[in-house]
Swiss-Prot record:
This is Large ribosomal subunit protein bL36. One of its GO terms (cellular component) is ribonucleoprotein complex. The gene is rpmJ. Keywords: Ribonucleoprotein, Ribosomal protein. GO terms for molecular function: structural constituent of ribosome. Belongs to the bacterial ribosomal protein bL36 family.
Amino acid sequence: MKVRPSVRRICEKCRVIRRHGRVMVICSSNPKHKQRQG
């Protein structure tokens, strides 16, 4: 999980979602693409 000031999709499979008021990126193809804004 990377924590970044601005998150964006890295590949086509990445999905931008909101959980508990936080913007996150989850990816089904590559778990290294997981990101959280903060």
